A protein has these predicted regions:
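Class I SAM-dependent transferase core
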Residues: 1-83, 87, 91-99, 114-125, ...
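Conserved nucleotide-cofactor-binding alpha/beta core module
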Residues: 75-196
Length: 217
């Protein structure tokens, strides 16, 4: 077993023992996707530390434990259609693709250099998810509606365009807060009557979601 694979298994076992990874589908995705393929070369040795890592351009790849929390509360299954807001490195989109299928994943990124970085990483790793260049605060109406919208940057609030692009009984998962430096992880479930039920999953810190309906630069 290579050192990277050994480190990956150790981290996944730790995430499982601490309760971050709860389901087989999330565990299998973590085992399948190599985080080292989605980070800059100078960070490769830190691929399986449970910490956020800079990918450049003011952006980060989240800590594996935070990613696991978000994926678990998203309740993903094969065949669900997912929009990811904030492609970043592409790692999270690859994990979602393992759980839902490549053809069911759309991911959107607004920073040109990050868009190219994430797209290159995903294609090199063999994933054919749809990568869109654009403002994630507007969602991506063209391929809507979605069963899940997963937001990987901090939003000042839940944006109406996301609500309008979710299926009945679908879910929006997002870190939300009125301050740039602290958020709560929220899950909004759309009820049959069209209203949303909000469930809080604790505090977190993400880079700001910049866009027309998000934070300003």
């Amino acid at each position: 077993m290579s050192q990277i694979n050994e480190d990956r298994e150790k981290l996944i076992n730790a995430l499982e023992s601490y309760g971050y990874i709860k389901s087989d589908i999330v565990k299998k995705a973590f085992l399948k996707v190599d985080r080292s393929n989605f980070i800059p070369d100078d960070k490769k040795n830190d691929a399986y530390r449970d910490t956020p890592l800079s990918i450049g351009w003011g952006q980060t790849i989240s800590a594996p434990s935070m990613i696991a929390i978000m994926l678990e509360v998203s309740e993903l299954t094969k065949g669900l259609k997912v929009l990811e807001i904030g492609t970043g490195s592409g790692y999270n989109a690859a994990l979602i693709a393992e759980m839902c299928g490549d053809e069911n994943v759309v991911t959107i990124e607004r920073i040109p250099e990050v868009y190219n970085f994430g797209l290159t990483n995903l294609r090199r790793a063999g994933y054919k998810v749809k990568v869109v260049f654009g403002d994630g605060t507007k969602g991506h109406e063209k391929d809507s509606p979605y069963d899940r919208i997963i937001v990987t940057a901090a939003a000042p609030n839940i944006i109406d365009s996301w609500k309008n692009q979710i299926t009945d009984e679908g879910m929006i998962i997002a870190p939300v807060g009125a301050e740039r430096h602290y958020q709560e992880l929220l899950v909004l479930k759309k009820e049959k009557d069209g209203r949303f039920k909000t469930i809080k999953h604790g505090g977190c810190v993400f880079v700001p979601l910049v866009g027309e309906q998000g934070w300003k630069e």
